[in-house]
């Protein structure tokens, strides 16, 4: 069976790591990844990857090229991750393949997923309110990550996409009265706003934002942290907490 996983994120975070682990640990089928060229280098080198330029869910040209690429690959299943990819595939799908969609968080608008043949949720909460065939597969803990033993803890750590849902603005604003350093690791469209918030609150000596790093480097940050903070406004099944 030939399965295409579709990820059109602009940054490599929890969803993308989830897909990377699926593709590198399930060898019984022919697995293929279509992703934005900006994040392709973060995935395991053994994965068969087709790179595409980033495009919006309403881009006629972007959807036309994607539809042609999928037709050339000729998969049995297209597995989408996130609302953007699910919406796009629902609008271009043919009868030649099945559409499986995974919901990785708590979403307000779940109707866009209901055109898929099967919906997977990372938690029961993520699947609430969906009137369709669903299955819950909880996020997992990767066995290669070792228990942290470092006692020389240096800072508080937060990890995730720099988007409003992750609540980093709330975390930064609350840090004014805390006498400790905070490291936020991630990339995304809220970066400039968060940096401005750090400056406005005179926190540049205590709070630092670091671009998304690869898994091996992220483990070093975990080992040097005294505490992990999850400030999300909503979470379906936080991988960072499992790590």
Feature map (PLM): residue ranges:
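Short His-centered aromatic/hydrophobic patch
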Residues: 80-86, 103
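Nucleotide-activated donor-binding/catalytic signature segment of Leloir-type glycosyltransferases, i.e.
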Residues: 195-213
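Donor nucleotide-sugar binding/catalytic pocket of nucleotide-sugar-dependent glycosyltransferases
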Residues: 115-146
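A short hydrophobic beta-strand element within the catalytic core of glycosyltransferases
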Residues: 228-229
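N-terminal strand-loop element at the rim of the active site
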Residues: 5-62, 69
């Amino acid at each position: 069976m030939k399965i295409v996983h579709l990820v059109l994120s602009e940054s490599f975070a929890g969803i993308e790591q989830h897909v990377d682990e699926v593709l590198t640990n399930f060898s019984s089928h022919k697995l293929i990844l279509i992703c934005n060229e900006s994040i392709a280098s973060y995935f395991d080198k053994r994965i068969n990857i087709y790179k595409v330029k980033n495009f919006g869910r309403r881009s006629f040209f972007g959807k036309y090229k994607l539809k042609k690429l999928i037709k050339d690959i000729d998969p049995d299943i297209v597995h989408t991750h996130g609302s953007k990819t699910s919406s796009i595939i629902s609008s271009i799908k043919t009868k030649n393949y099945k559409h499986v969609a995974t919901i990785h968080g708590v979403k307000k608008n779940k109707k866009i997923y209901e055109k898929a043949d099967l919906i997977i949720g990372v938690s029961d909460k993520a699947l609430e309110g969906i009137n369709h065939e669903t299955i819950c597969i909880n996020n997992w803990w990767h066995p290669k990550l070792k228990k942290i033993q470092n006692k020389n803890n240096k800072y508080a750590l937060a990890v995730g996409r720099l988007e409003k849902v992750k609540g980093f603005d709330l975390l930064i604003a609350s840090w004014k009265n805390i006498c400790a350093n905070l490291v936020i690791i991630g990339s995304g469209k809220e970066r400039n706003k968060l940096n401005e918030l750090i400056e406005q609150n005179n926190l540049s000596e205590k709070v630092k934002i670091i671009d998304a790093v690869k898994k091996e480097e992220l483990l070093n940050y975990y080992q040097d942290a005294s505490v992990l903070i999850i400030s999300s406004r909503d979470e379906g099944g936080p991988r960072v907490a499992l790590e």
